[in-house]
Amino acid sequence: MTIILATLTLVAGLLPGAIAYIGKLIVDGVVFSSQLKPDNQSFVNISQPLFYVLLEAIAVALLAASQKGLIVCQSLLRVLLAQRVNVLILEKALTLDLTHFENSEFYDKLTNARKEASIRPLSLVNRTFGLGQNALALITYGVLLIKLSIWAVVVLILAALPAFIAETRFAGEAFRVFSWRAPETRHQHYIENLLAREDFATEIKLYQLGEMLLGRYHSVFTQLYGEDRNLTIRRGMWGYLLSLVSTAAFYIAYAWIVVETVVGQISLGDMTMYLTVFRQGQSTFANALTSIGGMYEDNLYLSNLYDFLEEPVNQPWGNITQGINPQDGIRFENVSFTYPGSSQPALKNISLHLQPGEKLAIVGENGSGKTTLIKLLTRLYTPTSGRILLDGVDLQEWNVDALRRRIGVIFQNFVRYQFTVGENIGVGDVNNLKDSSRWQVAAQKGMAQQFIERLPQNFQTQLGRWFKGGQELSGGQWQKIALARAFMRSQADILVLDEPTSAIDAQAEFEIFNHFRALTQNQMVFLISHRFSTVRMADKIMVIENGEMVEQGTHTELLAADGNYARLFWLQAAGYQ
């Protein structure tokens, strides 16, 4: 593709000068032939002018073919480059820690990178080839004009410089405006999402939020449009005023060439050629400077992409795939964690030990740090201090893939993929994503098999409303799908359940956990739940308050201690009396 583009650019760059020169030969040939005509004869030898006409027609056809070829190549390159750059962005996103996605400045970088990613690389490539084409054309024009006078070339260059300087200045200003308003742009996109997504539609209609959100959308748009309008008007006004300089230079040169023709210094064909070359040269030089200014502007915007792709990635992962003491289970040793940008620790000095086969329930009010602890265990975060060990080895030293293959997890805000039922379960083990026999085993363990069999196409039923024929599930059914997803990892010996049954009634939850306990006798389980009927079934219970572990023991021991756990338990029990 690059070689073809280079060849077509070479042809398109050289032919305009050649066409202008052939035009001169045509005019001079016509004049010469008419002067040779005898007064008493009607015959005129027109073979030479007609030959030049044919030659020019061939050159024009080749120029048109090369220009059309450039358009075709650029269209194909646009698709390939956009795909490649988007893949680069997505591949980079996969390497980043979760903390990046919880940082608003990172989202500004991501928004700026993605917004221009599909057009700027192609624009830079096109302008680079365009600059090469214009440079070749200018060389041929310069060779022709220098025969007239070196000053013609100087005037051609100087006339285009003011507009180039102004355009470059405005390009820098446009980029600064673009960069500064990334938060407002994200805000606008967020409101678009709210108004266009089915998962938000119900609440927006019931709370009658539509007009309010549209008002905010218009407000943000008005602000952004105002900035764009002012810049565009100033850019256009200065562009017009400075283009008058180029126009004046052309007509001065025009007058000069006419005078030179009248006094006999140049032929009529020379005049035709110089006028054509000067006008086209003026346009070509302006285009070349525009390409340079555009390349400068493209590089400014691409700096956002470069910044994103160069975002530092923590690589704390080791290469250990097996622990030194498989019977030791999991240990937290004085683990603390503070979110980036926060001065208040989310967890402080957490220490616990869970042996193989033991079940630990984590209890605490919302915001106490329960889910943060789970994210540290699953290596979505790295402890600020302290360490977590699995089978006697620090999690930092484990190979990430080997570690995560050992963990089956359901978060409270699990993803409801707009895939088939089977794929929604299969994502729990991407290596067996299409294994239908594994789907069925996992669905049985997650107690989802019964309702799946009632769906129109069983495991092949499309879920969600985004695609044709999609079926929506109840909250409880989705949670059973999520449970089945966790059981896809048959080799996992650590199960993490963060409010896994919050959308299921108490009776169904009790049945699920009795079933679940029987299936996980040899697995370590971390359970977060606000339902004490479930929590009391754990071997150990840990109570977290403001990021600190304040109590630990069995259900009976904690009730006897009459502390926070007992208070929360009796508060919930009173609600059932």
Predicted regions and their residues:
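Hydrophobic patch in the ABC ATPase nucleotide-binding domain
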Residues: 95-98, 311-314, 448-452
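Conserved catalytic Walker-motif region of ABC-type ATPase nucleotide-binding domains
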Residues: 93, 217, 332-334
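Cytosolic ends of transmembrane helices, especially the final helix of ABC transmembrane type-1 domains
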Residues: 209, 233, 253, 271-310, ...
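An intracellular "coupling" helix at the cytosolic face of ABC transporter transmembrane type-1 domains
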Residues: 114-124, 177-183, 193-196, 205-252, ...
